[in-house]
Amino acid sequence: MAPWRRVDKVILLIMNVSFVFYIMHSLQDLRKGRSDSSVDNPRSHNQENTIFERLDHLDWRIYNLLQQAGNAKEEKKSVHRLLYPDSFLFKRWGTDLREEEQTVAQNLFLKYGYNVYLSDRLPLDRIIKDTRSPRYSISPLDISLPTLSVVLIFMNEALSIILRAITSIINRTPSHLLKEIILVDDYSSNDDLKGPLEAHIKSYNAQHVGLLKIIRHQKREGLTQARISGWKASTADVVAILDAHIEVNVAWAEPILSRIKEDRTVIISPVFDNIRFDDFELLQYAVAADGFDWALWCLYEPLPAEWYALKDETAPVRSPSIMGILVAHREFLGEIGVLDGGMHIYGGENVELGLRAWQCGGKIEVLPCSRIAHLERAHKPYLPDLSISVRRNALRVAEVWMDDYKYMVYLAWNLPVENPGIDFGDISSRKELRKKLNCKSFDWYIKNVYPNLVVLPNIVAYGTMKNTLKEDICIDQGPVPGNTPIMYVCHAYSPQVMQTSDMSHYNNSPQAFLIFSFFLCLEITEDNQASYRLVMQACSGQRWNIQHTLKDWGKTKDLDQKTEHSKH
């Protein structure tokens, strides 16, 4: 139906234009025929002026009608068969692309995880929305602010993405404050990140002498080592370590430099906004504190009550942790150990820095006046399964910084505390650093910095729970969290990770126990079609095995008596 409507629209416009041309032709004849008589007749002259004004108006209308006709033709022309209807790239974008263009865009999307086809066609100096609070105003220029080194980390990033990041930094950072931009290439293989990138660097430096530098790793060393390389190469008072897939917003640097000038021990995170991976639209994110869960995945925390009490939207936000982007006093960051070079690839390194900063004399803040737009990826081509490196790095953080609370990390990943089967590397130098800096305990951190991090006390065992009657199925939370638990084929992922505390069981052997309440036991019974379901029933002697234990349980006299009573 829609194509026929567009055809009707075009025909109607053509008819209107033809009619207007006929009227214009008639008026021109009228003008020619009466040109002599109008000289002697002022009234006739005024009438003709009115007619000619209308003629000019008709001329303008014709132009607009022709434009509409052209747009309608273009609209009809832009309808193409969608080759990749299931691709995330084409859910909101790309319906006007020809089929060969769709193929190019889709292949680039699979390679990079974002829309390189569009990025290559956007201006490098595009304008993005100023997302700061209206209450923020730029104070008079402070020439005494510290200087800034900006480090951009990349590995096989799209060239146009890197160039747009560089351009935004140059255009939106005062030149007297921006000392250098350091690119760190973690062993990229893309050809355009070699000669072509070098040519662009040369071009930038022709306009801004010596501003850009590049460091190239001779092997893949990972995100953390790339950041350390950038820090080592920096020479300004303050260093900003950023991803290369960002665009800084207006006046992003001055509030950070001013805050670090006030307190060199504060490590700053700007507020992230989101650049959508498909259409590159900017989505404004709310200001939030940075936190983490016990698996050390990053998350946003609500703003603390004391921040609201200030009634100042521009005030720094006290934050338990930090995301990947950070700005710090270069020397102070070195004094507390920069980053943990033993981290692999991705994940956990930001949480480690947050813990170390707080426990060793520094602090983390989010600064609402500083905004950076961060390009999201639909997928990470370089690491399809992020959990492998995050899990390994999380254990490393737990062993160095979390003291008696480390079991919570092992519980979150469903790993035994003893012999987890994962090599998290040598941590002796990091433990020595902690001792040298006289750092506070993790208990202090929980109580004074991150009380929202929920601790499960008195845990004696955790993991999957199997009934001795049928050991290939486990207790599962069910299809929806909070739903009625079910028995399901064992897979050991989070819906099946249980935990038990000192008084929630009856010990019968090191790992076999009853679960009971009011003299009834949690057991399984065979259901229809040879499946099993959970029931509370009179104890029949079934036992449960739980995967990992933290300590000896020991029998209690009271529980012995209750269980013996339940058997009669």
What are these regions (language model features)?
Residues 247, 251-300, 363, 369:
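Conserved donor NDP-sugar-binding/catalytic core segment of glycosyltransferases
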Residues 146-151, 180, 352:
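Cell-envelope/extracellular polymer assembly enzymes that use nucleotide-activated donors
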Residues 217-234:
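Glycine-rich, basic loop-to-helix element that forms the pyrophosphate-binding segment
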Residues 224, 299-331:
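A recurrent flexible, glycine/aromatic-enriched loop bordering the glycosyltransferase active site
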Residues 1-63:
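N-terminal signal-anchor transmembrane helix specifying type II single-pass membrane topology
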Residues 445-568:
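Lectin-like carbohydrate-binding module/patch detector with strong preference for beta-trefoil
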Residues 239:
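Short aromatic/hydrophobic "clamp" motif used to bind/position activated sugar donors
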Residues 170-216:
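Acidic donor-binding segment of Leloir-type glycosyltransferases
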